[in-house]
Swiss-Prot record:
Domain of life per record: Bacteria
Top-level taxonomy: Bacteria, Bacillati, Cyanobacteriota, Cyanophyceae, Synechococcales
Positions of transmembrane segments: 7-27
Official protein name in the record: Photosystem II reaction center protein J
Subunit structure: PSII is composed of 1 copy each of membrane proteins PsbA, PsbB, PsbC, PsbD, PsbE, PsbF, PsbH, PsbI, PsbJ, PsbK, PsbL, PsbM, PsbT, PsbX, PsbY, PsbZ, Psb30/Ycf12, peripheral proteins PsbO, CyanoQ (PsbQ), PsbU, PsbV and a large number of cofactors. It forms dimeric complexes.
This protein's UniProt keywords: Membrane, Photosynthesis, Photosystem II, Reaction center, Thylakoid, Transmembrane, Transmembrane helix
A GO cellular component entry from the record: photosystem II reaction center
Species whose genome carries this gene: Synechococcus sp. (strain JA-3-3Ab) (Cyanobacteria bacterium Yellowstone A-Prime)
């Protein structure tokens, strides 16, 4: 594993951030529309 083969930290942060935003967004959207069941 060379330093070039490693995934940049900012890419990991962006992917994780988008994942969290998507999950939270779907949860609040489901709750707002009345379709979201309590997790």
């Amino acid at each position: 594993m060379t330093s070039q083969a490693r995934i940049p930290l900012w890419i990991v942060a962006v992917v994780v951030g988008l994942g969290v935003v998507t999950v939270v967004g779907l949860f609040f959207y489901g709750s707002y529309t009345g379709l979201g069941a309590p997790v």
